[in-house]
Each structure stands twice: as C-alpha cells, then as structure tokens.
C-alpha cells in the first residue's frame, strides 16, 4: 500500500476514488510516565516515555487506516494527514487520527 501526503502519486493514475479512510487510536499515559515527565519538565530534556507512546500510537493509527482502505478496495492512500489531540482530565490520554483518501491506482 502506497501512502502519501500529496494528492497524487507521481507516475500513477488514480483509477477510482474509494472515499475518506480513517484510523483512530486513543491511548492513556500512566502515572509513572507522568511522574517522569514532570521531573524532566523541571530538569529539562526530552521525555522519551511520551515520545515512544506517540510513535506507537501513530503507527497504530496508520495501520488501522490501511486496513480500512483495504476493506473498501483501495490500494493506495493519498492526502494523508495525522492529527494529535490530548484528551481526558489533565491531558492524561492522547488521540491520534490518521486520515486520507483511499484510491485505486494503476499497478
């Protein structure tokens, strides 16, 4: 499956549009990570615990979007966009949404 943030794939023809496809993931951040993040916020430095969770969440959202595109018969996704949104009390959860347009391109 080809994924691109552009509205076309160079050298390929969009034969059919299958519609908008999404992948959504909501993950909680545990108190241990919150404690570490608060400490690093005070002392400075990157918060790898949160970064790792974002990487996992983004990959899960993209994979879910791919499955949904395949379910509607698409073999590529164009116009891919990824959004992040804190959720829950004090931002204790993160929502990651991957979206794009499922298309059938010439092989």
Can you annotate each of these PLM segments?
Residues 21, 26, 34-81:
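Short, well-ordered alpha-helical segments
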Residues 1-33, 71-75, 86, 92-107:
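N-terminal presequence-like segments and the immediate start of the first folded domain
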Residues 80-88:
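Low-complexity, intrinsically disordered Gly/Pro/Thr-rich segments
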